[in-house]
Amino acid sequence: MSEDIYQNLKQLGGETRIPASPEEAELERVANPQADVAYNVRFTAPEFTSLCPMTGQPDFAHLVIDYVPGPWLVESKSLKLFLTSFRNHGAFHEDCTISIARRLVDFLDPQWLRIGGYWYPRGGIPIDVFWQSGTIPEGVWIPDQGVPPYRGRG
């Protein structure tokens, strides 16, 4: 495999800072060297954090992102920094979850992408947000996201 696909990466292997906002965060991508194969890639962020836009209090979620790559793969450090940039970003759970998915779809042009946002309770109610870009490509194994429904201490 040629190292040329990595030459434009600016964040991996270097010193980086956490972006101040999702808008400032720079996602990076590399050409998919297995673009002729349909396969699933999963990223799990069990400690995702954002802020309530009304109270400024922290909100926490377990995010699971599955995608079937097209021509591009997301570079994982840039994804981590993008997700971390939400820690000082005020938005409702639904907006955070869908904004992440749409940004990835626009940037990567995947064959398919889905996101599950499993938000921990605020005010006693957990909010789960699910979205996918279309029908799962035929022949691709997409495992269950593996996040059980919230049960509290029960």
From Swiss-Prot:
Localization of this protein: Cytoplasm
Catalyzed reactions per annotation: 7-aminomethyl-7-carbaguanine + 2 NADP(+) = 7-cyano-7-deazaguanine + 2 NADPH + 3 H(+)
Record keywords: Cytoplasm, NADP, Oxidoreductase, Queuosine biosynthesis
Residues involved in substrate binding: 74-76, 93-94
InterPro entries: GTP-CH-I_C/QueF, NADPH_dep_7-cyano-7-deazaG_red, QueF, QueF_type1
Catalytic residues of the enzyme: 52, 59
Single Gene Ontology MF annotation: preQ1 synthase activity
Pathways involved: tRNA modification; tRNA-queuosine biosynthesis
Gene3D superfamilies on file: 3.30.1130.10
Highest taxon listed in the record's lineage: Bacteria
GO biological process terms, semicolon-separated: queuosine biosynthetic process; tRNA modification
Enzyme type, top EC level: oxidoreductase
NCBIfam families xref list: QueF-II
Cited function: Catalyzes the NADPH-dependent reduction of 7-cyano-7-deazaguanine (preQ0) to 7-aminomethyl-7-deazaguanine (preQ1).
Protein name: NADPH-dependent 7-cyano-7-deazaguanine reductase
UniProt gene name: queF
